[in-house]
Amino acid sequence: MKKVFALFCILLMALGCSGRQDRYVQISGYAQGGTYTVKLNMKGIGVPVETIRDSVEALLTQIDTTLSGYNRKSLVARFNAGERVPATPLFLEMYALARHYWERSGGLVDCAAGPIFDAWGFGFKNSRFPTEEGISSLLGGMGHLPETLPQEQGMVDPAALGNPCLNYNAIAQGYSCDVIARYLYGIGVKDMLVDIGEIWCDGVNPSGKPWAVGIDRPIDQAEEPSDELDGIWTSEGKPCGVVTSGNYRKFYKKDGRKYAHTINPKTGFPVSHNLLSATVISAGSAAEADAVATWCMVLGLEEAQALLLDSPGLEGYLIFEGEDGEMKEWASPGFTLRK
């Protein structure tokens, strides 16, 4: 996550020809190293658009100054540097969420694996290709995180935890969507789409139809979503988080071998399997979709399929490389993609 720039575009979309008395607003800007968009139906909302815009900006700034490992002045960056930091609600909530998914995944989604990600160059430091001895040393130094953070006079001391290095990238963007959506629900918004790299949507779009989301086709080193979509997924008007995780944007090659940014925290090494991307739909939260998508990418195809089939409230779409080298797809029973 990077600094939030106060650049917004507000568009009012009148729907006179549809017969609906809706008034949609779009707020766009820059956050977390990319662009974001918030679309919402202002029908029945007594809060001015400008206030909503300012509130969204303030929340994104708060997330950046609390949780961004790229912002050296953020609470998590200061914590990772060994500094005692205030136990703010956002800091505590993210830690609790991250630890929950660490426990639920059996350690495969691990916020304390920051040193491993840094060592491979996929974290907050410019490193690359560590030795096996170096990885073993890092794994040995990764401690067990308690269920709750110990506090003293409203402060959290990393030394009391063995000075862990936290990296929330596996759920940060999904969590950010949830924070913005929580604010919108609080002011009475029913129809919304929050897109901060990951997505939370609910209700219908300006045309009165359920929100539709394009699913990327995995193309190596595509820095931005490509124009080539694998298909369109439609929400059916129900609230849900939508997240795609994959190894086709962040990786590097050495001696002819591809090293992807998905790392197994238990082995300390990038995964090597035929699963190219995992799209997860969660009825609960975008943070859950984010965490489970990462979890799937660590597991690989067969175990990811089993996870999605055995998880109520989750649907998934997996793109993988078949034995013939061609891309193939698998979808859980409740996931419908329109090609």
Protein language model features and the residues they cover:
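Mature catalytic core of soluble alpha/beta enzymes
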Residues: 4-8, 15-339
